[in-house]
């Protein structure tokens, strides 16, 4: 299809270990909106141990900045492709994972729990880090099996022989999102009625809608040139369906003590004791 421009949002662990504060989330939300206004597909690359959990970040409304970025990336009317290239933990990765298509490199890890919380699970349930990772399910293969990601890329950062796999995914991933939106519009003409209602509200907004738009922190389209087409509406709707599919729900009964899944019984303490005893006996 020839050369195309895309917007890239990436986390870099060599700078501040990839930890984002409120200022990073706010800037990213602005960039995402800017890309969408220019009709540029958005690529997000996740590699972070999590959002900044310290007092200064929370004092600057860290939680709100994360929520705003999630809302902005869910609201854009262009294809969004998310790829986990390394670590993807907690609020640092969740916003960038709000994409039409979510992929993971074969050595990538992803979880909504912060690393410190995982460490608490290790101590609480007497688990080794390997056992904790197994029960929680953070590897790319476990994530795919659980339905939390859409695919695995056969590439590891630093490899040169498989770099074409990564480059191919960038192209085919965006093309598949666009193909899916085109097929959805063709098979569901009712979306045209929905789009027509959107146009009507844009041309003749109600006073209450105008008041809501005036107080919104999301970037709203004000000029006809920037206004999304029907495929932009399809991207948003299909993204919502994809995100809804990844979210798992449970009842209080299933979550409580009567749950069918037993609490894992770790053997970390026993294993450490055996190793220390073996070392002591060999020293004797």
Features from the language model and the residues they span:
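A structural preference for short, pocket-lining loop segments at secondary-structure junctions
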Residues: 1-15, 25-53
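Intrinsically disordered, low-complexity segments enriched in small/flexible residues
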Residues: 1-6, 10, 15-17, 167-284
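Short, solvent-exposed loop/turn segments at secondary-structure boundaries
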Residues: 19-22, 56-58
